[in-house]
Amino acid sequence: MAENNRAVIKLKEKFAASILDVREFRGEVTVTVAREKVVDICRFLKESLQYNLCTDVTAVDYLGKQEPRFMVVYNLYSIPNKDRLRLKAGVPDADCSIDTVSCVWNSANWLEREVYDLMGVQFNNHPDLRRILMTDDWVGHPLRKDYPLQGPDREPYKGRLS
């Protein structure tokens, strides 16, 4: 049960008002947190509970399905405890930003850049938030649900690709 998970118990003790939901599916625990507390919660997970590896940062676009529109998802792993934890934080379309966790895990740096590039989520205080996959002159964020399926009307890229 997710409620008996050590990390969930400790998170609820320290950040009760910021823990919005806890779920378990196929043995993996997902904790939804308030976006305003994401850095504090991540720092606590790393320093106190030994979640020393951020393996992935991604985002989901729920356009027309739920609010907030975006959900930023952090996949975390504790090497000493051999334990996984998924952390989620909602990000509204009107203020499509969340604080960076690259100050907690260096591995989040390029992962957040990818989310910014493809989904348009801004990571506040990120050390180098710029496109990482698309060209610098690319218009829009191609993994958003409202992005045109055929891409934007534009000239083919004439720059060097490799």
Curated annotation (Swiss-Prot):
It is a peripheral membrane protein. It catalyses: a quinone + NADH + 5 H(+)(in) = a quinol + NAD(+) + 4 H(+)(out). It is an enzyme of class 7 (translocase). Keywords: Cell inner membrane, Cell membrane, Membrane, NAD, Quinone, Translocase, Transport, Ubiquinone. One of its GO terms (molecular function) is NADH:ubiquinone reductase (non-electrogenic) activity. NDH-1 is composed of 14 different subunits. Subunits NuoB, C, D, E, F, and G constitute the peripheral sector of the complex. NDH-1 shuttles electrons from NADH, via FMN and iron-sulfur (Fe-S) centers, to quinones in the respiratory chain. The immediate electron acceptor for the enzyme in this species is believed to be ubiquinone. Couples the redox reaction to proton translocation (for every two electrons transferred, four hydrogen ions are translocated across the cytoplasmic membrane), and thus conserves the redox energy in a proton gradient. Belongs to the complex I 30 kDa subunit family. This is NADH-quinone oxidoreductase subunit C.
